[in-house]
Amino acid sequence: RHYCHPNIHETLVDLLRIQLEIQAGTLAVADGTTCGSGPGPRTMTPVVKNLLFASTDQVAIDAVSAKLLGFDPMDVKCIRLADESELGHGHLDDIEVVGDMDTAEVKRTDWEFVVGDNAASAVGDLFWFGPLKPLSKIFFQTPIVNAFIMASFIYHDYIWYPTEGWGRVEKWLDETQWGRH
């Protein structure tokens, strides 16, 4: 998976293209009961939103989710590329939303979620997208990658989770309907 980080958006579009060739019309279900704001996927802050999304248009479900989170779907490269490749709909004007929310409400909604880096992803960004990119093949396509995997494991499981993460989980368990059941 480390090979894909520098081209993650293009990789996701390629995977969608393959999925549509193999099995078009697959129903996607996105669980928005508890969403995550902040650097992810392991260090997000849980936010209860109590929504479920379903669609046979994989791009549309991502576009609606992105908009609700507070992002312009067409600014998310994989959504834009998939829309331009006609693999699905990324423009909200081309998507009909029905259920507890309609398209107009989705367009008005902005949960103001944020993205960002934690210590582990900030180091990765230096190699995948930043000034150390010329060295990325040496570090991520050789056995040296195991040192990064171990460092991420130590950071997330032995530093971040005990000092920050467990408190977030306890709060979610104590204060939400999802934690009490």
Where are the regions that the model predicts?
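Extended, low-polarity segments enriched in aliphatic/aromatic residues
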Residues: 1-181
